[in-house]
C-alpha cells in the first residue's frame, strides 16, 4: 500500500494520494488520522540501530553479566565506564507552558565542549567523574585509579566498558598488569551502547542540566554538569536509580524493517 511503500511524512501527503487515487476527500485532518489508525497505521519515528549488531554476542554478554552478579562476593563491586562530551550550547526541549507565553533560550556565544571520563556503581549510585582535555589511555588510567581509591577495602572491582581503542591501549594493559591491581576489565560487545547503563546516565544528565537551560559561560556549564554527576546523582540515587538500570534487552535487526 502507499503508506508502507513510501513512508509519507505528513497526513497531507496521504490525503493527497487518497484524493488522487480513490477520489475521496477528508474534510478534517482528525478524520483522516482516525481512518489511518483504524487501518493499523501510526505516526512514529524510526529507531536508530547500529549496522553490525550481533544477537548472539548480546545474549552471551547478558548471560555472562547475570552469572557474574549472581556469584559476586561481598568484597567485590561492579562499575560501568564511558566517556561523554557535553557541548556548551542551548538544547531546547518540549515543555508545558502558559499559552500566552512565547518561550526562548539565549544562545551561547560559542560551542565549547567538556570531556568527561566517568564511572558509576549501579548498586550504590557512587560515581567517579574526571574532566580531561582528551579522553585517551592516560585518562583511562586516571579513572581506574580513582575507582580503586573509591573502594580501598575491596578485593576485586569489575569494570565494564566499550571497545574504544584507548581502553585497549598498551599503556592501560601495562598499568593493569602491575602487582596489587584489583581491577578486571570486561568489554561490552561492539556496537552495543544499549548494554552500557551509563549511557542512560548521560541522558539523565541532559534532561536535568542542559535541556531548556542557559549557562553564561562554559565554566558555569561545566560546574553544573560535573556537580550533577558527582554530587546530585549519588545523593539522590534512590530517586534516580530506576532511570539508570541494567535491565538489558537484545536488539535484533531482524525484528525491524530497516529503511534504506
What are these regions (language model features)?
Residues 1-28, 72:
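A short, amphipathic alpha-helix used for macromolecular contacts
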Residues 14, 32, 82, 118-119, ...:
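Generic structural signal for small/hydrophobic residues in well-ordered secondary structure
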Residues 27-40:
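Major-groove recognition helix of helix-turn-helix-like DNA-binding domains
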Residues 31, 74-76, 198-260:
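C-terminal anion-handling pockets and recognition modules
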Residues 55, 162-163, 170, 186-210, ...:
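RNase H-like two-metal-ion nuclease catalytic core shared by retroviral integrases
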Residues 60-145, 246, 251-260:
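Extended, low-complexity cationic-aromatic segments
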Residues 102-109, 177-197, 214:
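RNase H-like polynucleotidyl transferase catalytic core
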Residues 139-157:
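Short, basic/hydrophobic alpha-helical segments
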